[in-house]
UniProtKB/Swiss-Prot annotation:
Class of enzymatic activity (EC top level): ligase
Subunit structure: Homodimer.
Listed name of the protein: Histidine--tRNA ligase
Gene source species: Streptococcus pyogenes serotype M28 (strain MGAS6180)
CDD domains reported for this sequence: HisRS-like_core, HisRS_anticodon
């Protein structure tokens, strides 16, 4: 058997990992500006945490979850999304307690798992950045969270992003619309895909979310949920639109957007961009005011979003965005002979302890090969260390571009490398 990674997974090698780290750091910095703190939840949860919150009839639960019984006969699932685990943690750790400052703002970065057909930007193990805000029903919370995602895209230089917006209203609004949608779709039931025929019985709003061509055709002229919003839902949605306009965030209303999870109410949104002629969703979320209560906590409003890191990085690459990643090394030590081995290790370690990036040769190669490595590492400074340098207690360090050089004692290198570097690079 050939030992390879499982289908739908990936190895993220150092060159790519640097891009991941950069995007993650920009996300962390952005979220901290909005007073969000990081939360880390287990990669696996009890099956019911996901099935009951995401929805028993959703594709995620019926087709895509990795679930199994462990050795204690507990039904476990690898998390397919981030919101339900965070809500479970919010309730379990009593973050709703009066002494905890509201709203509670949390973000997470981690792996999610779904059994689906692997394709570009969509894997079976994928990585998600997400945020959740608990305790505020104010529509300004919706807009601030959407604006935070928009702010992140601006910082990363992502272009041609369109905000798609809709409201699912209150449970009462949705119930009235549900019956209207059933009445509209039932006469064309046979024209729907098999999945959507099932959805029509179980959760007809899911038909609007279908990607199948025949389903898209069927719902093209479906009644709009916005016509069924009650007064409170309408006021909430109008406030969201007004505040988005006040922040100069353009949007389009998409009445067929329902999102792939059952827990949403009121505002839902997606950020969509075009890549090579195809529309791609890069971020999606919305309001969920009943989920905390569903997990046994007090009724608590919530709002959040998730975005896929793989897809985000693919879009960055396709749009030709160069991320400002530091790839240069401060100093490279070329080592000649066994007599310099110990001193080279001592020096390189002392230089690193002063805050510099440094590498040395460990393979006993010829000097030409070592200088080639220095160039590959984009080393700013290069030092050659052999038997004569060890005996003298000093060595020549040179600027790898200008070739300017200076002879420096080991003592100075080990205690004051900043001055040496400044002298050669200024």
């Amino acid at each position: 058997m050939k030992l390879q990674k499982p289908k739908g997974t990936q190895d993220i090698l150092p060159e790519d990992a640097a891009k991941w780290q950069y995007v993650e750091s920009v996300a962390r910095d952005t979220f901290s500006q909005y007073n969000y703190g990081e939360i880390r939840t287990p990669m696996f949860e009890h099956y019911e945490v996901i099935s009951r919150s995401v929805g028993d009839t959703t594709d995620i639960v019926t087709k895509e979850m990795y679930d199994f019984y462990d050795k204690g006969d507990r039904h476990i699932t690898l998390r397919p999304e981030g919101t339900a685990p965070v809500v479970r943690s919010y309730v379990e750790n009593k973050l709703f307690a009066p002494e905890v400052q509201k709203p509670v703002k949390l973000y997470y970065i981690g792996s999610m798992f779904r059994y689906e057909r692997p394709q570009a930007g969509r894997l079976r193990e994928f990585h998600q950045i997400g945020v959740e805000c608990f305790g505020a029903a104010n529509p300004a919370t919706d807009v601030e969270t959407i604006a935070m995602a928009y702010h992140l895209f601006e910082k990363l230089g992502i272009k041609d992003v369109t905000l798609h917006l809709n409201s699912l209203g209150s449970p009462e609004s949705r119930s009235a619309y549900r019956q209207t949608l059933i009445d509209y779709l039932t006469p064309m039931r046979d024209q729907l895909s098999k999945d959507s025929q099932r959805r029509l019985d179980e959760n007809p709003l899911r038909v609007l979310d279908s990607k199948e061509k025949e389903d898209k055709l069927a719902v093209e002229k479906a009644p709009s949920i916005l016509d069924y919003l009650d007064e409170e839902s309408q006021a909430h949605f109008e406030a969201v639109k007004d505040m988005l306009e006040a922040l100069d965030i353009p949007y389009v209303i998409d009445t067929n957007m329902v999102r792939g999870l059952d827990y949403y109410n009121h505002t839902i949104f997606e950020f969509i961009t075009s890549v090579e002629g195809s529309d791609l969703t890069i971020c999606a979320g919305g309001r969920y005011d009943s989920l905390v209560g569903y997990f046994g906590g007090p009724e608590t409003p919530g709002f959040g979003f998730g975005l896929g890191l793989e897809r985000l990085l693919m879009i960055i690459e396709k749009q030709g965005i160069t991320l400002p990643i530091e790839t240069e090394m401060d100093v490279y030590l070329a080592v000649l002979g066994d007599s310099a081995n110990s001193k080279a290790l001592e020096l390189v370690q002392a230089i690193r302890r002063q805050g510099f990036t440094a590498e040395r040769d460990y393979l006993g190669r010829k000097i030409k090969a070592q200088f080639k490595s220095a160039d590959t590492f984009k080393a700013k400074l290069v030092m050659t260390l052999g038997e004569s340098e060890v005996e003298a207690g000093k060595a020549v360090i040179k600027n790898n571009r200008s070739r300017q050089e200076v002879e420096v004692s080991f003592e100075d290198m080990m205690t004051n490398f900043a001055n040496i570097s400044e002298q050669l690079l200024s």
